[in-house]
């Protein structure tokens, strides 16, 4: 009955908080963001091998989504237990952990793309294809660590913390 490794929804308008489990089987979610379509992107730091980005398309289904930990790290099976963790959601993107450590993500409605970064300075941009698959369309490496993103919706500028780098992104 532990809440470890889970993402919860809490209705703060109720006198008694009863957590609604949205997802479980998560190792170390450093970044979580919800887009204008109520989809949740989860950046899950791996243990030894894989950094993974997950997409939950329906936050209100009432059925928790299984992301696979501790049997899976991303899409890689790390434990052999056929009874544990059936129906595991596959990540929309993953990469080898060295170097890595996912820290920040931001869905960009204007260009229908997901921007994310890791602590070691790599910024990546994903785009969804018509068949639903996601693919990497851009990767940029900078010298400094990245802790988070901020979007100025009026100017459409993206700011990167902690160094206040400004990004301008367009997808043709």
Segments and roles (model prediction):
Residues 98-103, 141-147:
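Short coil-to-beta transitions that initiate beta-strands within beta-rich domains
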């Amino acid at each position: 009955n532990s809440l470890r490794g889970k993402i919860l929804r809490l209705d703060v308008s109720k006198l008694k908080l009863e957590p609604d489990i949205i997802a479980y089987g998560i190792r170390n979610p450093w970044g979580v963001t919800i887009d204008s379509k109520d989809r949740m992107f989860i950046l899950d730091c791996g243990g030894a091998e894989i950094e993974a980005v997950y997409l939950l398309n329906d936050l209100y289904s009432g059925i928790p989504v299984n992301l696979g930990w501790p049997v899976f790290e991303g899409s890689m099976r790390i434990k052999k237990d056929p009874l544990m963790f059936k129906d595991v959601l596959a990540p929309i993107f993953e990469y080898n952990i060295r170097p890595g450590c996912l820290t920040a993500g931001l869905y960009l409605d204007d260009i229908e793309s997901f921007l994310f970064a890791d602590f070691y300075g790599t910024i990546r941009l994903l785009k969804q294809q018509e068949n639903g698959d996601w693919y990497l369309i851009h990767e940029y490496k900078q010298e400094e660590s990245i802790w988070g993103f901020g979007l100025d919706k009026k100017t459409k500028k993206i700011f990167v913390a902690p160094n206040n780098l400004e990004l301008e992104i367009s997808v043709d």
